[in-house]
Amino acid sequence: MSWQAYVDEHLMCDIEGTGHHLTSAAILGHDGTVWAQSSNFPQFKPEEMKGIITEFDQAGTLAPTGMFIAGAKYMVLQGEQGAVIRGKKGAGGICIKKTGQALVMGIYDEPVAPGQCNMVVERLGDYLIDQGM
């Protein structure tokens, strides 16, 4: 399966038969290289990706300033150190799951709930980890 198919079929999917979908999603390498993305995934800056990687390595570094994706500021919520970062921005948010080689990212807005986004992103991330990726 191609990386784009993972984004299209597993991240941008109908969530639990509700007819709701993530706003955008992507799979990236740890260096910030985009492997696959939805058509509307925001164009992030290299320094934003560096901040995300640092947060995975040293949890709490983004808490004082927030996490930025394409200039949009997300308040960093409790995640799982070294494995998951969750952020909130208004009625929406972001979930990022780190695997051995990739970052699986999902951005959502209402009516998608935070837990639904987390489930979709983390399920794919866990699958990739199980596959040695």
From Swiss-Prot:
MF-aspect GO terms: actin monomer binding
Location relative to the cell: Cytoplasm, Cytoskeleton
Disulphide-bridged cysteine pairs: none
Source organism, top-level taxon: Eukaryota
Cellular component, GO annotation: cell cortex; cytoskeleton
Main location: cytoplasm
Keywords attached to this entry: Actin-binding, Allergen, Cytoplasm, Cytoskeleton
Subunit structure: Occurs in many kinds of cells as a complex with monomeric actin in a 1:1 ratio.
Job description of the protein: Binds to actin and affects the structure of the cytoskeleton. At high concentrations, profilin prevents the polymerization of actin, whereas it enhances it at low concentrations. By binding to PIP2, it inhibits the formation of IP3 and DG.
Annotated family: Belongs to the profilin family.
Name this polypeptide is given: Profilin-3
Protein's organism: Ambrosia artemisiifolia
